[in-house]
Amino acid sequence: MSALTPASEVMLRHSDEFIERRVLFAGDLQDALPAQFEAADVRVHTQQYHHWQLLNRAMGDNVQYGLTVDAAFVAECDTLIYYWPKSKQEAQFQLCNILALLPVGTDVFVVGENRSGVRSADQMVEDYATLVKIDSARRCGLYHGRLDTQTEFNLEDWWESYQLHDLEVKTLPGVFSRDGLDVGSSLLLSTLDKHMKGKVLDVGCGAGVMASVLSKLSPKMKLTLSDVNAAAIESSRATLAANGIEGEVIVSNVYSDITGRFDLIISNPPFHDGLQTSLTAAETLIRGALKHLGVGGKLRIVANAFLPYPDILDATFGSHEVLAQNGRFKVYQATVARAPRDAKKKK
């Protein structure tokens, strides 16, 4: 997230317009532009914890992480710069929330890569603001308008659910596989045994599906779920509650806020950060697993078959096995066969 994205480069072409403005950045931020942006005041709201981590170092309390925006946090803002995400439902949710809090007359800028679907921005907000395209460069579009009417936002209106066997899965916009179980996760779930014991960590938990299924198969396992996405965190908590399942749900950038060791780590790790391809999270997941698994502990992940995870698994654990595969996905497992290095040092 160090280099500027094409969308941010387009914004910089208009940077002189913001010198005296009180700006709120929101949406699919992929770089540190807000930390170097010149304006009377700059604030950021993000649903992504790893984005908050980066920006918080430079901006402190002017960066807010959470599912929804705090009204007091944006009370003085007169300009919104919104980065369009790849999920249209996520954009609808975030804009409806933000535009319910900003005053009528607020300048609204929407920027995004054309492939993200940003061209539909004007239609999405036409009841609240008239957006006009004011720039096009780097395969991005920049739109501007003024808020004519505040939106009405009620979080309860955005919840959806679906049934998976005897489980009720609760989801919010922006959560992976919001409308049903994806093929990769289904393949991983097919490898889980019944009556396992110990502690399990579900990294990138989404709506909490995998951990919930595991709980039904092995009720004695102690569950910990983690994700960077605020919508996923709230969805997982709601899924556990709806099914009477006990578990701890933690906001964490892979292992950043995780302590202790586990008997099993499961994950369907992402290989995109927004629209950009990124293996960072998966590589961190694999390489950092030794510090969070006990002797005999297992890391079990599902991934697209073309991704280069076997080499990383072998370099980290010494070997791996393929538990299941289909035409697109493979389920890999690696086992800690000896005491992790940091444990040896303590002896």
UniProtKB/Swiss-Prot annotation:
Q: Which GO terms describe its cellular component?
A: cytoplasm
User: What's the domain of life for this entry?
Assistant: Bacteria
Molecular function GO labels: 16S rRNA (guanine(1207)-N(2))-methyltransferase activity; nucleic acid binding
> What Pfam families is this protein classified in?
MTS, MTS_N
**Cell location:** Cytoplasm
Record key words, sorted: Cytoplasm, Methyltransferase, rRNA processing, S-adenosyl-L-methionine, Transferase
Reaction equation(s) it catalyzes: guanosine(1207) in 16S rRNA + S-adenosyl-L-methionine = N(2)-methylguanosine(1207) in 16S rRNA + S-adenosyl-L-homocysteine + H(+)
According to the UniProt entry, what is the EC number of this protein? 2.1.1.172
Which PANTHER family does the annotation name? RIBOSOMAL RNA SMALL SUBUNIT METHYLTRANSFERASE C
Described purpose of this protein according to its UniProt entry: Specifically methylates the guanine in position 1207 of 16S rRNA in the 30S particle.
Quaternary data:
Monomer.
Give the family from UniProt: Belongs to the methyltransferase superfamily. RsmC family.
- Quote the protein name from its UniProt record: Ribosomal RNA small subunit methyltransferase C
- Tell me which species this is from: Serratia proteamaculans (strain 568)
Give the gene symbol: rsmC
